[in-house]
Amino acid sequence: MALNTLGSHYKPNKITNRKLNRGDIYLVDSGGQYEFGTTDVTRTISLQNSNKRIKDIFTRVLKGHIAVAGYKLKKNTSGSKIDNEARKYLKQIGLDYAHGTGHGVGFFLNVHEGPHAISKNNKVKFKEGMIVSNEPGYYEKNNFGIRIENLIYVKKNKQKNYFENLTMAPIDKELINQNILNDSEKKWLNNYHKKVFHNLKGVMNKVEISELREACSAI
C-alpha cells in the first residue's frame, strides 16, 4: 500500500512507477521558485482509504503539526525545544520519524537552508521574520508513508513572537480520526480551513470553489 511514499523524497522512475489504486494514500511534496519567494508543501491524500491504523497515525502526525503551529515562542526558543512537541503523539504509541521536523527555506537558492531548523540538535534561536517548514511524518517499511508540511514564519505582535502559516492548502479530513483530536485541535483545523477557503476562492471557478468548500468544511 502506497510503497512510493516510504522515502522522505521519492523520485519516479520506470522501475518504481505504479498506478494509483482505490485504497491507496498518495503523498505529494511540491513547491516552486517565484519572484516573491520559494514554496514547499506536502500533503497526504486518501484515495478512499479506510484503514483505521493509517488514520490513527495520520491524526497523530496532524496533532504534532498543530502543536508546532501553535507553539508559544519565548525569547530563547530554538528548534530543538519544538522538535519534541511534533513527535510526542507518535512516541505515545512507540513510533517516530528519522528526519527533522522543519528546515529553513532559501530564496532562489536551496529549499533547505539554515541556520535555523526544527530538529533535535538545532540551537539557533527563532527571530521575527524567519521562515521554517513544519513537517512531521511517519514512514513504515514496505507499507506506507505520511507527512503534513506547511511553511510557517515568526510573526511579532505586542512584544510576543508566534508562528503564522504561509501555506494555504486543505488537509485531507478523510484520514482524520476525530476521536483522537481534542477540542482545541479541532478548532485550530477549522480556523485554518476557513483561512484556506478565504484565500483561495478568489482564483477558482465555480466547480473548484465547490470542491474547495467541501475540503475546507468544519469537522
Predicted regions located by residue number:
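Active-site neighborhoods and metal-handling regions in enzymes and metal-associated proteins
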Residues: 1-219
